[in-house]
Amino acid sequence: GATLVVKEKIMTHGVQHAETKFYVDLNGEDSSTNVVSRSVAKEDSTQVFYSQINGNNKCAGHTECDAIIMDRATVKAIPALEANNLEASLIHEAAIGKIAGEQLIKLMTLGLTEAEAEEQIVNGFLK
């Protein structure tokens, strides 16, 4: 079976708008996909992530969206799964949240400013 792997990394700031849409049809026996999005939204930016996986045969599909939201930004994650075969195994995960205060404090105790600590966390998240 064929395998499709999609990995995206997005950072928006200012009034930028990013929208991604992934539609995957798993038609072949033992086909699979892994669609992963990691993003950071800052200031007044907006992001929309949409993924649709259709399991039309014996297959495995996974979609994941993890986002850090900052300032006044907005993030929307819309994962959709459709199993059209008894042997289709489909999973979706989505998590949106701010940088944890304890992460910032830990890095600041090592001598980083708050801005430097945020930058380190964001860079590590997107790697």
List each model region and its residues:
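Conserved beta-strand/loop scaffold segments within soluble protein domains that form the structured core
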Residues: 1-112, 122-127
